[in-house]
UniProtKB/Swiss-Prot annotation:
Sites where the protein binds Mn(2+) 1: 284, 298
Protein name: Carbamoyl phosphate synthase large chain
Family: Belongs to the CarB family.
Gene of this entry: carB
Native source species: Enterococcus faecalis (strain ATCC 700802 / V583)
Residues reported in the UniProt entry to bind ATP 2: 707, 746, 748, 752, 777-780, 820, 832
Record remark on domains: The large subunit is composed of 2 ATP-grasp domains that are involved in binding the 2 ATP molecules needed for carbamoyl phosphate synthesis. The N-terminal ATP-grasp domain (referred to as the carboxyphosphate synthetic component) catalyzes the ATP-dependent phosphorylation of hydrogencarbonate to carboxyphosphate and the subsequent nucleophilic attack by ammonia to form a carbamate intermediate.
Length: 1060
């Protein structure tokens, strides 16, 4: 059926900020969909609150609204734009839930807006646990025995009837939020209570556990003519019981017989047809390893994390085609853009193995609960492609950037057998490494299979890797064994360790013996038809399919997996850099390992290498392509860390040179540069031991900020108040040494702000100054940022601009740089300089209209800023006020303290813009999911040193009609100042109503909790209070500056009511 002509204007809903369970895959899907609709001639309106995405760039849609995805704001935009139709299936769970809410509010009927893609009834049938169960019964598709419950007691009664273990799955939540596996009644009560609270419809499905079955996924597409195909099927390495987003996954499936494959394929197609979904859909199934019995676990009636993986694994652009299906096109009418000859109804075939490994944030949250279950915890993922499982898996392991170049972690050699067994049975994020260690110790794969229920086939592949290790050890310098190791994904570094040689020696020996990788094309059809996609992976075979062009090329290094501290902002900068390289007439080549992002869409660059970002893998591409140089400024710390080793290999780094990068990162050189430029910085020094740190701190005075050198996202950074805490930090948080010194700085309390600048060696363009709402001490990525500055005097702004210019020219910066300042007692100090793109680039680019990464790339390639139409100094400010607010994923990460400090904890960001600061703040809070009631109770639990300041805030809350509740010390203090306050007891002293009861019973609408600097039981109480607030979805502020910002909003919305 040809595309519809009765609709002209379509609204697309994005997925909002990046959180665990909903990451960059929706930026990729949404960008593809908007462009596909524009290609077909429709007018596109986009609503998304996330400024860090390519999707919210002006050119992606005809009308781009960076506004909160809430009923209030989306309704307003619908009334203003009057679209004919709405496409919600590309905005993840956020988009689906918003569509349901809009429909229930009646506005879609009122404005006559049609829902495209998937009907509401289908969303309901797939998402509402009860309706889904009924549909499966009608289709005679088996589902685990289960019951829908609305209370904890109903859940307990069902469990008593069918026995434990059982699984709790809340309705309409994302990434398994609030769900979990229960072995006892006590666990069930706790998880069911939490799950019912987090489900927007207070409904959970309690089902018999089928943990241990094989977990299989099918990614399917259907059109309005009822054509349906399987794009890709995938098999989880981990059996049922671990969320698929936290599982290692292989595509295509590896252990299914043809009969099993066809049986599950038929079931998946039957389901998508019954739901009448038009577009993409993901079906998850559980297969009994000992029979042909299977169960349908769940269906996602939308584009998902798995469809991004399936798109990158096959090259088949699911989101693009789903958008076109939504407007009436059919699979047999659309060409597959990969081959350009076959039609989209042709099922992709793979002649390689794809593996995906999740990337977890536990390097940031050492105290976080690492056990994996049905609730997702990974922030991102990596993908690798190889000719066999071993090669694919080992390439994925080294893509993770966790310091592992092979499936082993050195520290596991000290673990006892008992501990090893425990960690394999109760899976954590590092189970793969424990399994490998067990095989090295001589456990049989049959033993491991009975402990973990992982298929013998996969365990045998791990065994094969370890057999090759043994062969390498006993055959040093043997070319045949070396070749076998390389064909199975071994890194030069691992072989070097086994042969007692250097990595360079192995690389030289390998090249001397003609053992070099070739690059194969990802073509969706297993080479059955000719195809010309510029999308490649490496393998050790004979024929190379990547032809080097005559045109000079530039290699851009991507930023790898999404993790805390290095998010989608860096992918945004990478994509823009590529556009500028192409515009300058060069061939742009991207290397990256993240399947979720826009940068790894093969249509973005001239050539895409889907490879790990390690020195060996990058050098292999450089050896083949011979680019004029490499750009490292846009790939975060991942790319910057490769600058020095690449330079040593004779590779040209474009932009700021490695010597100048080092002057910004190396403490002594940086101090020297600042002294020469006469720019002040907080007093401090470098310590190579704990004793030295104490001496420095005594000299400059407490509090001090301590951190290791060369970090991103403030890893292991702390503010320390006294000598005992400093010794404690030096012992536990860092291993100081002459090679890895620790920086000890005087901690200056003051207003913090930051600047992004672009320099071409002569002119310094400063797009804007961003002022942080939280004082120095909260990581810049976790602070709310305001542009243009609201409280900085013209004089201070001039000083900041002057220092920025001096630094950019003094450090010979070419390209981007980011500088953070603190204003202490009316003096400007430099805290740090990052000679690369920072996470604020997309935010500032959107509001100033300067495509910063493109302009910086042009400067890197030798163009002058004045020729591009830019002047020296600060760019004129915009009329509106823009607020960038962080978004956290604490509900998914148990046992993590939500207190904000110098170590970054947020996973995403939103933006609020308006002509008044208060309105922009309101939008930012709304967009970040903090919905503020206009009345209710505020719970205060305040550390002694901030009580005076908190008093002012309490007075203002009281003045606009809030009641005050506080823990003992705080309540006495407020009462002494004549404020009406209700006192509650501490946790450690449970007489009467405790502070936790107040939160649990819904008697606090806002919680303000500051941390006592001298760590005692007060802090343990504080931790419990903060966790309780997060788990009950109550707005929590750990900084009085943020509370002050909230008050501004509430006061601006409050009216005075007084009797005459």
């Amino acid at each position: 059926m040809p595309k519809r002509t009765d609709i002209k204007k379509i609204m697309v809903i994005g997925s909002g900020p990046i959180i665990i369970g909903q990451a960059a895959e929706f930026d990729y899907a949404g960008t593809q969909a908007c462009l596909a609709l524009k290609e077909e001639g429709y007018e596109v309106v986009l609503v998304n609150s996330n400024p860090a995405t390519i999707m919210t760039d002006k050119e992606i849609a005809d009308h781009v609204y960076i506004e909160p995805i809430t009923l209030e704001f989306v309704s307003r935009i619908l009334r203003k734009e009057r679209p004919d139709a709405l496409l919600p299936t590309l905005g993840g769970q956020t988009g689906l839930n918003m569509a349901m809410e809009l429909s229930e509010s009646g506005i879609l009927d009122e404005l006559n807006v049609e829902l495209l893609g998937t009907k509401l009834s289908a969303i309901d049938q797939a998402e509402d646990r009860d309706l889904f169960k009924q549909l499966m019964e009608e289709l005679e598709q088996p589902i685990p025995e289960s019951e829908i419950v609305n209370t904890v007691e109903q859940a307990v009664a069902f469990a008593k009837r069918i026995g434990y273990p059982i699984i709790v799955r809340p309705a309409f939540t994302l990434g398994g939020t609030g769900g979990g596996m229960c072995d006892t009644e006590e666990e069930l009560r706790q998880i069911a209570e939490n799950g019912l609270k987090l489900s927007p419809v207070t409904q959970c499905l309690i089902e018999k556990s089928i943990a241990g079955f094989k977990e299989i996924e099918y990614e399917v597409m259907r059109d309005s003519a009822d054509n349906a195909i399987v794009v890709c099927n995938m098999e989880n390495f981990d059996p049922v019981g671990i969320h698929t987003g936290d599982s290692i996954v292989f595509a295509p499936s590896q252990t299914l017989s043809d009969y099993e494959y066809q049986m599950l394929r038929d079931a998946s197609l039957k389901i998508i047809r019954a739901l009448k979904i038009e577009g993409g859909c993901n079906v998850q199934l559980a297969l009994d390893p000992h029979s042909f019995n299977y169960y349908v676990i769940e269906v996602n009636p939308r584009v998902s994390r798995s469809s991004a993986l399936a798109s990158k694994a096959t090259g088949y652009p699911i989101a693009k085609l789903a958008a076109k299906i939504a407007v009436g096109l059919t699979l047999d009418e659309m060409k597959n853009p990969v081959t350009g000859t076959t039609y989209a109804e042709f099922e992709p075939a793979l002649d390689y193995v794809v593996s995906k490994i999740p990337r977890w944030p536990f390097d940031k949250f050492e105290k976080g609960a690492r056990e994996l279950g049905t609730q997702m915890k990974a922030t991102g993922e990596v993908m690798a492609i190889g000719r066999n499982i071993e090669e694919s898996l080992l390439k994925a392991v080294r893509s993770l950037e966790i310091g592992a170049y092979h499936n082993e972690l050195a520290e596991l050699s000290h673990v006892s057998d008992l501990e090893l067994t425990k960690k394999m049975v109760h899976a954590q994020d590092d189970r793969l490494f424990y399994l490998s260690e067990a095989i090295r110790r001589g456990y049989s794969i049959e033993e491991l299979q009975s402990l973990t229920k992982i298929d013998l086939f996969f365990l045998d592949k791990l065994l094969h890797i370890i057999e090759i290790e043994t062969a390498l050890e006993s055959h040093v310098d043997n070319v045949a064994v070396l070749k076998e190791a390389k064909q199975n994904g071994f890194s030069d570094r691992k072989i070097a360790a086994l042969w007692g040689q250097t990595e360079q020696a192995i690389a030289d020996f390998r090249r001397a013996n003609q053992i070099v990788p070739v690059y194969k094309m990802v073509d969706t059809c297993a080479a059955e038809f000719e195809s010309h996609t510029p999308y490649f992976y490496s393998t050790y075979e004979v024929e190379n399919e990547s032809n080097v062009s005559k045109k000079p090329s530039v290699l851009v290094l991507g930023s790898g997996p999404i993790r805390i501290g290095q998010g989608v902002e860096f992918d945004y900068a990478t994509v823009h850099s590529v556009k500028a390289i192409q515009a300058a007439g060069y061939e742009a080549i991207i290397m990256n390992s993240n399947p979720e992002t826009v940068s790894t869409d093969f249509s973005v660059s001239d050539k895409l290498y889907f490879e790990p970002l390690t020195l060996e893998d990058v050098m292999n591409v450089i050896d083949l392509e011979n680019p004029i140089g490499v750009i490292v400024q846009f790939g975060g710390q991942t790319a910057i860390n490769l600058a020095e080793p690449l330079t040593k290999q004779g590779v040209k780094i474009l932009g700021t040179t490695i010597e100048d990068l080092d002057r910004a990162e190396n403490r002594d050189l940086f101090e020297q540069a600042l002294q020469e430029l006469a720019i002040p910085q907080p007093p401090g020094d470098t310590a190579t031991s704990a004793e030295e740190a104490v001496v420095i701190a005594d000299r400059i005075g407490y509090p001090v900020l301590v951190r290791p050198s060369y970090v991103l996202g403030g890893r292991a950074m702390e503010i320390v108040e006294n000598q005992k805490d400093l010794e404690d930090y030096m012992r536990h948080a860092v291993k100081a040494s002459p090679e890895h010194p620790v920086l000890v700085d005087s901690y200056l309390l003051g207003q913090e702000c930051e600047v992004d600048a672009i320099c071409d060696g002569e002119t310094v363009l400063i797009p804007g100054i961003m002022e942080h709402i939280e004082r120095a001490g909260v990581h810049s990525g976790d602070s709310m940022a305001v542009y243009p500055p609201q409280y900085l005097s013209q004089e201070i702004q001039a000083t900041i601009a002057d220092y920025t210019k001096k630094l950019a020219l003094g450090l010979n910066c070419v390209g981007m740089m980011n500088i953070q300042f603190v204003i202490h007692e009316n003096r400007v100090y430099v805290i740090e300089v990052n000679p690369r793109a920072s996470r604020t680039v997309p935010f500032l680019s959107k509001i100033t209209g300067i495509p910063m990464a493109q302009v910086a790339t042009k400067a890197i390639l030798g163009e002058k800023l004045t020729d591009l139409g830019y002047q020296d100094g600060l760019y004129p400010e915009s009329k509106q006020v823009h607020v960038k607010a962080p978004v956290f994923s604490f509900t998914k990460l148990q046992k993590v303290d939500t207190y904000l400090g110098p170590e970054m904890k947020s996973t995403g960001e939103v933006m609020g813009s308006d002509y008044y600061l208060e309105k922009a703040l309101y939008k930012a809070f709304e967009a970040s999911g903090l919905h503020l009631p206009s009345y209710g109770a505020v719970l205060f639990t305040i550390a002694d040193e901030t009580k005076e300041e908190a008093l002012e805030i309490a007075k203002r809350f009281s003045a606009i009609g809030y009641s005050l509740v506080a823990t003992e010390g705080t309540a006495d203090f407020l009462a002494k100042h004549q404020l009406p306050v209700k006192k509650v007891t501490k946790i450690s002293n449970p007489e009467g109503e405790t502070v936790l009861d107040v939160i649990r019973n819904g008697n606090a609408q806002v919680v303000i909790s500051t941390m006592d600097k001298n760590r005692s039981s007060a802090n343990q109480d504080g931790f419990s209070i903060r966790r309780e607030a997060v788990e009950h979805g109550i707005p929590l502020f750990t900084s009085l500056d943020t509370a002050n910002a909230i008050l501004k909003v509430l006061e601006s919305r409050a009216f005075t009511t007084e009797a005459i």
